[in-house]
Design a protein with these regions (language model features):
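Conserved alpha/beta-domain cores
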Residues: 1-157
């Protein structure tokens, strides 16, 4: 499930947690017990959002290397937490795997896992049913990241 398409073409209004939850839940229930892999927002040069103006430093020669995918999500923690809560809530309805795009560095892995745990805690404290998220994976798209998997793999497990 490529979640970024829910965030695009919305005239500056991002989907809230409830809207995302309903979409993910429908996908999970529609798969009737088969696992669903939900990729967190992967926006950037090739899939820009109409909501955010270009930030300082994003006008370099290769915009694909700028603030995108997990880097964008980590820079927008309230949006990312809402997405994570929606995914965890949908996982109460069937098996869900979480795919994090362009997760490359150990620090990004630690930040992401910390936010996943925070989202779990928020749902638990609110008494909201959630699934475990059967696995968390990362999309590897660069040679450097592929080579570093041996090092960062200990962080990701």
């Amino acid at each position: 499930f490529r979640s970024e398409f829910m965030f695009m073409g919305r005239d500056g209004h991002l989907p809230d947690e409830e809207e995302q939850y309903q979409a993910y839940r429908r996908a999970v229930e529609g798969m009737q017990g088969m696992p669903v892999t939900i990729r967190t927002v992967d926006v950037g040069a090739d899939k820009p959002l109409d909501r955010t103006p270009m930030r300082a430093g994003e006008d370099h020669l290769n915009p694909a290397l700028g603030l995108r995918a997990i880097r964008w999500s980590l820079s927008e923690p309230s949006m990312f937490l809402a997405q994570l809560r929606a995914i965890l809530r949908a996982a109460a309805h069937g098996p869900v795997n979480l795919l994090i795009p362009m997760l490359a560095h150990a620090s990004e892995i630690r930040q992401t896992l910390s936010l996943i745990n925070r989202a779990r805690d928020q749902l638990t404290n609110a008494g909201v049913p959630q699934g475990g998220g059967d696995s968390v994976g990362r999309a590897v798209r660069s040679t450097n990241t592929a080579i570093s998997c041996r090092v960062t793999g200990a962080e990701a497990q």
